[in-house]
């Protein structure tokens, strides 16, 4: 039965889903031959193993030579596979489905597939200088290259060879994909301090061109340089589609059939084709997520591909190219057809067109039209196959927009506000707005019983606020109970018990860990949820008080307790947490704060919500940029919250805790959705599941006390 069900759809849809690329550079001509490169390609896993062995034996010159060769071999292997696949797809295109079924109707399709397979094997063998099987590597090696582990070896080897600039490049390249690697962060700081801050530029040797161009486009857009923004966004799109082709090609390699023992796998022809092809197709479908995910992150940039067209539609409008603005706006609507702002923009752009142009003749950009058409076909086929072949698949929302559009009423500088209002034009595209923070303070506190204590002026600084009664005494006790049940020594500090001072012990826990512990019954679920709820409460207060026009996102949330170690408190002159800024590298001697990696440059606001006062010391302090002159000192107590902007205008630290345990919820926020906290997203999903379960219990009239 399965053969009769699935053979026709596969025959019909394969030509639609597997054509030669229609974008990302000129397509390969069927008669075009690949240029050959001299010399057989050495397997990158062997070079990697040789380089690592040389490093451990102290032969650093050989380590550098072999590790660099391994990286080159890895890149060249990907290029060869991509080029061979495109070359063979062009030489052996899949035929259209025959007009009527009859004997041998499927033979033209299989002839093309066999020809493509023969071409691909020949191409790979010729360009690799030997059989492709020599280049199959283990999952461990594949994972090491994905995590950029060879660059960790390289930075150490280059230091041994006194090649500081190359060491910094390698260290930074590794750190980009491993942003929580505290040792590497310290290495980069040390290298740059040795050479001088200005002497060395941080280079990511594995940077993706489409990401680099996109980031450059955003910067020019925010600077109102729309001509340059257009240039970079268009370049980003060209590079994106090239990367998409490579990603999809690499999905066509060997697949693992985890549900079957190899010797017991005796599928029929069409079942075998379907099993393999579905794995390939799901992998290709996920390239949207792959290309939107920055190195070292699990969560993709939200709405990444559509955002290019969102930026472009407004940028083209600003330079007076209304037809292109309309094309990009309509392209964006392919992904978000109900976006009211962009629908309004389409109406406005159409009103600006020359009378000789029919608005109906202006269609969405062809590149995204083709992309979305294929994406929808893939989605339909995967869902249908999942139902018919009995495998599990959940379609992700690839174009999700978190929290909706929050800055829809903002009008970028230089645009006539009255004119925009008359035409109903919605201009709200700057996702990381430049805020005049001196003028944005004093908004509503949103909740009853919260007591305003001091503002920026009273705290002798900029963008600061002190509030009381954000938590009740009962909530403080409940959070303390949660902390006692879930905190681990060194959590949040790479397992280091005393990351800032040897005289105190640090313990921590995240929101997600609290919710998981509550779900598993290790702490009361209600108490675990309180941690989640009060952090959201703090976020809303900060967003409102500082009068932000765009959504404030969580960047990191951490419950932390620091305990004074007995016998180590005599004549202490150190700090519990040294003076620092939250989004830049503080340089007290130069009175500067360098907003560059490895600092968390994306953080915009910070907050500390205190849980107790039964300890000695531990005052929170603000200082001047010299890290010595104290401008304000705050004694923690239950329910007190200090919040401030995260930049060099607010250097701060914590005085030594000399007795007892000091506990607080530390929160960092960002205005850039690209840097949202992954664990917070996962915590949101846990809360949604819990809410659904609770709703189901109410519908079934189950007593809440029966909850496990």
Swiss-Prot record:
Keywords: Dioxygenase, Disease variant, Endoplasmic reticulum, Glycoprotein, Golgi apparatus, Iron, Metal-binding, Oxidoreductase, Repeat, Sarcoplasmic reticulum, Signal, TPR repeat, Vitamin C. It is found in: Endoplasmic reticulum; Sarcoplasmic reticulum; Golgi apparatus. Residues 557-671 form the Fe2OG dioxygenase domain. Residues 1-24 form the signal peptide. Gene3D superfamilies: q2cbj1_9rhob like domain, Tetratricopeptide repeat domain. It is an enzyme of class 1 (oxidoreductase). Inhibited by pyridine 2,4-dicarboxylate, an analog of 2-oxoglutarate. GO terms for cellular component: basement membrane; cytosol; endoplasmic reticulum; endoplasmic reticulum lumen; Golgi apparatus; intracellular membrane-bounded organelle; nucleoplasm; sarcoplasmic reticulum. InterPro entries: Leprecan_dom, Oxoglu/Fe-dep_dioxygenase_dom, P3H, Pro_4_hyd_alph, Pro_4_hyd_alph_FE2OG_OXY, TPR-like_helical_dom_sf. Fe cation binds at residues 580, 582, 652. TPR repeats lie at residues 44-77, 148-181, 210-243, 306-339. The active site is at 662. Its cofactor is Fe cation; L-ascorbate. A motif (Prevents secretion from ER) lies at residues 705-708. Belongs to the leprecan family. It is linked to Myopia, high, with cataract and vitreoretinal degeneration: A disorder characterized by severe myopia with variable expressivity of cataract and vitreoretinal degeneration. Some patients manifest lens subluxation, lens instability and retinal detachment. This is Prolyl 3-hydroxylase 2.
């Amino acid at each position: 039965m399965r053969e009769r069900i699935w053979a026709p759809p596969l025959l019909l849809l394969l030509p639609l889903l597997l054509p030669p690329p229609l974008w990302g550079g000129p397509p390969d001509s069927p008669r075009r031959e690949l240029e050959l490169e001299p010399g057989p390609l050495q397997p990158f896993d062997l070079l990697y193993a040789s380089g690592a062995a040389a490093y451990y034996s102290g032969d650093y010159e050989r380590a550098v030579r072999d590790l660099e060769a391994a990286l080159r071999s890895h890149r060249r292997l990907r290029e060869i596979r991509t080029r061979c696949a495109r070359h063979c797809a062009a030489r052996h295109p899949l035929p259209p489905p025959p007009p009527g079924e009859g004997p041998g109707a499927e033979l033209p399709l299989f002839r093309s597939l066999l020809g493509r397979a023969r071409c691909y094997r020949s191409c790979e063998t010729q360009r690799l200088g030997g059989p492709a099987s020599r280049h199959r590597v283990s999952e461990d090696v594949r994972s090491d290259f994905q995590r950029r582990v060879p660059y960790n070896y390289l930075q150490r080897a280059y230091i041994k060879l006194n090649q500081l600039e190359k060491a910094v490049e390698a260290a930074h390249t590794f750190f980009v994909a491993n942003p929580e690697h505290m040792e590497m962060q310290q290495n980069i700081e040390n290298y740059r301090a040795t050479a001088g801050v200005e002497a060395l530029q941080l280079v990511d040797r594995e940077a993706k061109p489409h990401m680099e161009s996109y980031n450059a486009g955003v910067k020019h857009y925010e600077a109102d340089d729309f001509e340059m923004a257009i240039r970079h966004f268009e370049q980003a799109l060209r590079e994106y589609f090239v990367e998409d082709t490579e990603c999809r090609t690499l999905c066509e390699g060997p697949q693992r059939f985890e549900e079957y023992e190899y010797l017991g796998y005796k599928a029929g022809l069409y079942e075998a084709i379907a099993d393999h092809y579905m794995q390939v197709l799901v992998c290709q479908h996920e390239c949207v997520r792959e290309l939107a995910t920055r190195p070292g992150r699990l969560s993709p940039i939200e709405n990444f591909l559509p955002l290019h067209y969102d930026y472009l539609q407004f940028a083209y409008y600003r330079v007076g190219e209304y037809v292109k603005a309309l094309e990009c706006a309509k392209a964006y609507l392919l992904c978000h057809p109900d976006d009211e702002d962009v629908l309004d923009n389409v109406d406005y752009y159409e009103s600006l067109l020359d009378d000789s142009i029919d608005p109906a003749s202006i269609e969405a950009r062809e590149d995204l039209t083709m992309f979305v058409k294929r994406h929808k076909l893939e989605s339909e086929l995967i869902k249908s196959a999942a139902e018919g072949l009995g495998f599990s698949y959940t379609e992700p929302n690839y174009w999700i927009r978190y929290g909706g559009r929050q800055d829809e009423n903002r009008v970028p500088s230089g645009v006539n506000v009255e004119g925009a209002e008359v035409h109903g034009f919605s201009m709200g595209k700057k996702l990381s707005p430049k805020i005049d923070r001196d003028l944005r303070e004093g908004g509503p506190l949103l909740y009853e019983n919260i007591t305003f204590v001091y503002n920026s002026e009273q705290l002798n600084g900029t963008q600061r606020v002190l509030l009381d009664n954000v938590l009740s005494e009962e909530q403080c006790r409940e959070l303390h109970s949660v902390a006692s049940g879930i905190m681990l020594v060194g959590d949040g500090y790479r397992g280091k018990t005393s990351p800032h001072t040897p005289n105190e012990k640090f313990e921590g826990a995240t929101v997600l860990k609290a919710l998981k512990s509550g779900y598993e019954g290790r702490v009361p679920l209600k108490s675990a949820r309180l941690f989640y709820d009060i952090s959201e409460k703090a976020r809303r207060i900060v967003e409102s008080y500082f009068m932000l026009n765009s959504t404030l996102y969580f960047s990191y949330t951490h419950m932390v307790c620091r305990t004074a170690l007995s016998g180590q408190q005599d004549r202490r002159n150190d700090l519990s947490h040294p003076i620092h800024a939250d989004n830049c590298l503080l340089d007290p001697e130069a009175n500067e704060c360098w907003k560059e990696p490895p600092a968390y440059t994306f953080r915009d606001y910070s907050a500390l919500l205190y849980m107790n006062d039964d300890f000695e010391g531990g005052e929170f302090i603000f200082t001047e940029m010299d890290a010595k002159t104290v401008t304000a000192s705050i004694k923690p107590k239950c329910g007190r919250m200090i919040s401030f902007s995260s930049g060099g205008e607010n250097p701060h630290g914590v005085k030594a805790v000399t007795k007892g345990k000091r506990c607080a919820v530390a929160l960092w926020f960002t205005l850039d959705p690209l840097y949202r906290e992954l664990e917070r997203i996962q915590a949101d999903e846990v809360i949604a599941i819990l809410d659904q379960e609770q709703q189901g219990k109410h519908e079934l009239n189950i007593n809440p006390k029966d909850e496990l």
